[in-house]
Amino acid sequence: VMDDSDDRLAARLAPALALLAAVGETGHVTRAADLLGVPQPTASRRLAALAEVVGAPLVLPSGRGIRLTRTGRTLAAASTRALAAMTAAAREVREEIDPGSGRIVLGFLHLLGRTLVPSLIGGFRERNPGIRFSLAQGSRQDMLDALHEGEIDLVFVAPMPLGDPGLVSRPLADQELLLCAPPSHRLATRTRVRAADLEGEDLVTLEHGYGLRQITDDLCAAAGFEPRIAFEGQESETVRGLVAAGLGVALLPRSDHPPAGGVVEIPLSPPVFRTVGVSWPAGERLTPAARAFRDHVCSHPTDLGPAFRPPRGKRSGQA
């Protein structure tokens, strides 16, 4: 339980957060001073004064630089976290004043970067030219983890995290998944294939943590067999290339372009779709710029090509 002395100590430490964080980052008083734009003697005096306030040394000499003591490391780490929170707050305050000039950190799966992301961003930027985007790509699990940790504002993801109470999701489109096989494969001449036809086949798929991997595993389980995974990758184009080389078959979205000569795309029976959606943190945690983009995405149907259809998936959470 924090007592009054803790409050008083925290209040005296607060003005030195930037110095403590800079010393922790650089390991050198002079470099920390340069980073903050203050004279080195001033930084040294402030550190000495802080040590007196705390009652323990914060730094020790180490070669030509310094190293933090255990107490110093604790305070430097806390200072870094506190400054990150203040930076985020300053950004939000600035965007509250001028929502038209904010920055949106948008996460998405690799497979969605060709059509969905450019289409949705392009339409929004026409009406909001001052808003900037930082784009992050990764696996489904990586993107959802980053969303929970506040590293990104929104994520385009499939399948949607409908069971996560900390996130709100809205469907955008359903994307058909097809079996990709080399032309010489026994299934290549079929007009349709069933999931059960894949039993015993060498499958090329994405690693665990990717949405397509989960869909592949679930489809095989529903058909009553465990998939025989021959190769795992992190990029759909790598998976497609392995299929073209005759190393297995794969479940992938329809190609944006006519498939290359080394790959045949075969619809499944019944058809298999995955719902692509947008997810964001529950509650009022979005900046004005991110809220504007979310509203644009959720209210503007976009023609994304033959691989997509209007969504039939469910939504989750409260906006």
Stretches with model-predicted labels:
Residues 51-70:
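A short LG(V/I)-centered, amphipathic sequence patch enriched
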Residues 101-163, 233:
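Central regulatory/effector-binding core of bacterial HTH transcription factors
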Residues 116, 264-307:
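A late-sequence structural motif
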Residues 139-144, 148-152, 158, 207-264:
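Hydrophobic hinge/microswitch elements
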Residues 164-171, 175, 237-283:
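Beta-alpha-beta core module
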Residues 166-177, 181-203:
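Flexible hinge/capping segments at coil-to-helix
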